[in-house]
Amino acid sequence: MAYIEKDYIAVNHIEREFYFQGKYGSKGEKRDKKKHSSLEIKEYNHKQQEKKIRRLIQANFFEHDYYVTLKYKKGTRKDIKGFQDDLSKFLRIMRDKYKRLGVLFKFIYRIEIGKLGGPHVHIIFNRTQGTDTMIKDAWKRASEDAGSFQMETLDNENGFERLAAYICKQPDEEVKGQLKFALVEESNKKVFTVSTSRNLIRPEPVKKNYVHWTMKKILENGPTPTKGFKIDKDSIVTGINPFNGFTYLWYRESRIDPISREEYENGCKDKPICQHKRKISH
């Protein structure tokens, strides 16, 4: 029985997906199509978005890059246009500052409304010298309503899984209620959209097709990691995709000795240490 392997490869992480029809180790079975509820479809699409954002983070950001929350002064209320105008100006100022240093500015952001109706913005971006001072200056110049900001460094534990989940989280009913007071009704949906800079690496899977062996061996012995990587045991997931009937195996590998942004930008990407080679037994 043929199956497909899809590998999403980043410098410090590799995500592997195996898909095939039927039971593991046996000829495929045809399954009846099931009608799915709107809630099931919504949850499935949300998980797919989390995967997409997680892979974007893995492909473009490193441990010790920044996760920043920009806040407005207490009591500030703005519609979506006001949000976007302030944020666009902030990003433009930051981009210019990075450009003067000869550094490409990359980012992922999401505008959010707090439970008390306070607007704020979550942004992930690459680190460079003097970033904290840049943020303070750029935010004050971008908006007369600029308040405080919080800055944290990224932790690549679990392949940025928790970070991606937070960036993509759905608003609860309390927050949805606040939107009626904080924003124009027709603009609500835009608030929770994840946006990115155009210069991000967009990871595409490396696909492999196999017809000479089944998943029985890999299930019995367990998957084998790429040299220099370890398999995150908690990441191994098997099951059946309810939307296409394909049985799947998914897991993540993480580099044992992670490569830093400095190592990568100083030419590591052109050296063997940044390349991944893995043997597959047939």
Residue ranges of predicted features:
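Right-hand nucleic-acid polymerase module
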Residues: 1-117, 127-282
